[in-house]
């Protein structure tokens, strides 16, 4: 009799074979893998969510139609730095001391998705926003970063020892806006003496798309590649290319118009990336993830024109509007098309899922918090991937378990919400369900005891840096 783990692996292979027979080419041993991350894009701003009639994302909608759209996809934190640290490691960022945007760099003890995919035989690349290097809160570091990069939080400087080239990425075009620390140029040529600081003042989303296309062109058809694309949009500054706002001339609010224009530019970029893959015969056997690092900011002076409708809250908060984000996975040769997945997932799941697609099992000693989603998406496993999901950010902490969500604010304030009810996070049910409150309190305390620092916040923290 075969061991359970072997049976599970055999069943997964057979399920891929069945999907492949229906979809076309057979699944290769190692598909190409691309992870696309937008910046501050709210849950409402994906056309296929059906929340807003002013959103136009035909390429992202097509990606969802060709794969799986996650109805309850979450970021690992409600702001940029910890969210990206979680995605890149597959571990809760609070486990290794990254909780706010003021924290960093990513500890050397943590292995990134670049490290893992390189070990799996992939050539690895990163384009765009990195934001897990040395914190610009450090005065000496500030002096070595171009002023626009300090303002917009990218930390791209050739003097930084925490660039992606030292964190598992063979090649990179790293930067958010104008200044890029790069190992190759937009023509696809290797830059001697890398990292080289390049300046390109053109529209940032287009530059980042061109860098992604250059990386694909360098490696298509040679060996499997892994590419992380960190678009710096629709995060402020609201400066889309001149032709994009005209698409939304009917939108009266100028910030909303600019935000929609930036999202449309990302959508165009994803379309160009997919077209490049198809032209090279790679469209069927490339696994693409798309998500946002957190929800949209809504407060006056911080808003970027994106929206979280109908969710409660915004960037920097642990209500749904802060962490529930667009989340799509498509792999025509390996996943069913047109599926809407109902169970909660989190960006921590991207790393182990990518590894599984590459034929690599996560090891227990890695202590990943994310899980391989493939058997859940192919139907091999029907239960929810996670019993609970957890967050801690500044003065807030939260645990989600199925339809229930418990929020904590210091010193001892608790709110229980039924996410399956029409009221969602607008009605506190702590008095009505004391048993659920007790159960989830215990789970949250146990999880918090494993974080660094351990425990739940005992007092409000001033300015947890949610910019």
What does each of the following model-derived ranges do?
Residues 2, 18, 23-414, 421-467:
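Formylglycine-dependent sulfatase
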Residues 1-12:
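Bacterial N-terminal signal peptides that target proteins for export
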